[in-house]
Amino acid sequence: MRDAVTTLIKNYDLTGRYLDRNAMDELKAYFESGSARIAAAAMINANSATIVKRAAAQLFEEIPELIRPSGNAYTTRRFSACLRDMDYYLRYASYALIAADNNVLDERVLQGLRETYNSLGVPIGPTVRGIQIMKEMIEAMAEDSSLNSTDFIASPFDHMTRELSELSV
């Protein structure tokens, strides 16, 4: 798992360059946004169960066939697996927020996930929608909590959505 600083330094090191003005600006932005990123992650940590529960309720309201007989979230086991996966995406999104780098999502979440879901018959569309619902909830919570900057919140969720989607969203 890398953060924005490690990634930046690695890229400059690979090309044998000193950190230039652009690198310094990126570092400055990273450190200036640190408090907001920590506050957002703390907000997610404190409300994770509620976020997952409400996001799942909204998802099943939007796509009720998921919880009907023969739906992918029908039966307690499948429903629990759905909630577990949503919690997993949320937890790793919080790690990516702190790091200001989506690399952890590629390494720990996304690598092979679409193929696994396809082989198990888990529909990707509702998964993507569930991730987006959580993003929308967290953005609303961040605005309500008066976080100074919330621009960074969408990044990990949109990254997962893009990578999981068959089509560009």
Swiss-Prot record:
It is found in: Cellular thylakoid membrane. The keyword Electron transport applies. The modification N4-methylasparagine is found at residue 72. Keywords: Antenna complex, Bile pigment, Chromophore, Electron transport, Membrane, Methylation, Photosynthesis, Phycobilisome, Thylakoid, Transport. Disruption phenotype: Increased levels of photosystem I (PSI), decreased levels of phycobilisomes (PBS) and photosystem II (PSII) per cell. Cells are unable to undergo state transitions. When combined with an ApcD deletion mutant the cells have decreased PBS, PSI and PSII, and require glucose to grow. GO terms for biological process: photosynthesis. Signal peptide: none annotated. Gene3D superfamilies: Phycocyanins. Its main location: membrane. The keyword Electron transport applies. (2R,3E)-phycocyanobilin binds at residue 82. It is a peripheral membrane protein. One of its GO terms (cellular component) is phycobilisome. Contains one covalently linked bilin chromophore. A variant beta-allophycocyanin (AP) which forms a complex with ApcE, a phycobilisome terminal emitter that influences energy transfer to photosystem II. Belongs to the phycobiliprotein family. Heterodimer of ApcE and this beta chain. This is Allophycocyanin subunit beta-18. It comes from Synechocystis sp. (strain ATCC 27184 / PCC 6803 / Kazusa).
